[in-house]
């Protein structure tokens, strides 16, 4: 089997974490003949003992939206297809992102969400999710996704048989995180680099939090992040809000462990790793009242209507009513351990024979 990680961006991101854990689980169950990856990641995978096929760094993803990169990938992917066919023939190929390699029929892609179908970040993304991805989903041998909510959305939106779609949940290792009982007076927002993350809804409802708490926003250097910074200035919150970029995992663990709560009011999500990571850090989470969070977090989270000030007020007040035991969220986090992911990878291999 070939694993296509050619569009995988920088290490440490949610996509990177999912891909590495997926690869680890797959390797314990099946033979992995080679990894397709960007040159910048080649050394990492070679040290793990994988045979590597490299692609130029320019085709991998970054935290910045690029109008050029998808076009470069589209052209380059045909050359990559020929390389793969010549070297590996019709071997099974799986990609942990939604990007296909043309001409290859025996491949599986991973569609983490179809949010861009409804809320695209660019015109190219809109065209891709509404037309090109639809064709890819129909052509591919199988499709993976990260929640049953997204599975249903893919089947309905692209009119494909749900039996062609398998779910493999994200994995979080509780021991990677720091559990603290004592919390500091700041809310934390993680991954707030794009408009659908909707952290502006929390900022603009400043009356419910800014008198008693601060806000730390971990995000990329994107247009949306710049708009948030301007909003903070306009609302006279500069002394209450801190923006952090390029945060390491070790730094993020500390932020999680000390936060009074994570706020994650997304309009749409495929799964949502930060709320699980926050729970692994004994930190309460406030999330938007959308179906995927009810699937993933069940009754472990506090739910809000992000546009309703009273809803935010109620959620923040309810944090005080939560159990204070340091193990209060362990049962929710345990649903997403590595063994569960490995079992779901095994189920996919059985379903897609």
Curated annotation (Swiss-Prot):
<comment type="function">
    <text>Mannosyltransferase involved in the biosynthesis of the repeat unit of the lipopolysaccharide (LPS) O-antigen region. Catalyzes the addition of a mannose to the rhamnosyl-galactosyl-undecaprenyl diphosphate intermediate.</text>
</comment>
<dbReference type="GO" id="GO:0009103">
    <property type="term" value="P:lipopolysaccharide biosynthetic process"/>
</dbReference>
<dbReference type="InterPro" id="IPR028098">
    <property type="entry name" value="Glyco_trans_4-like_N"/>
</dbReference>
<protein>
    <recommendedName>
        <fullName>O-antigen chain mannosyltransferase RfbU</fullName>
        <ecNumber>2.4.1.378</ecNumber>
    </recommendedName>
</protein>
<keyword id="KW-0328">Glycosyltransferase</keyword>
<dbReference type="Pfam" id="PF13439">
    <property type="entry name" value="Glyco_transf_4"/>
</dbReference>
<comment type="pathway">
    <text>Bacterial outer membrane biogenesis; LPS O-antigen biosynthesis.</text>
</comment>
<dbReference type="GO" id="GO:0009243">
    <property type="term" value="P:O antigen biosynthetic process"/>
</dbReference>
<keyword id="KW-0448">Lipopolysaccharide biosynthesis</keyword>
<keyword id="KW-0808">Transferase</keyword>
<dbReference type="InterPro" id="IPR001296">
    <property type="entry name" value="Glyco_trans_1"/>
</dbReference>
<dbReference type="Pfam" id="PF00534">
    <property type="entry name" value="Glycos_transf_1"/>
</dbReference>
<comment type="similarity">
    <text>Belongs to the glycosyltransferase group 1 family. Glycosyltransferase 4 subfamily.</text>
</comment>
<dbReference type="GO" id="GO:0016757">
    <property type="term" value="F:glycosyltransferase activity"/>
</dbReference>
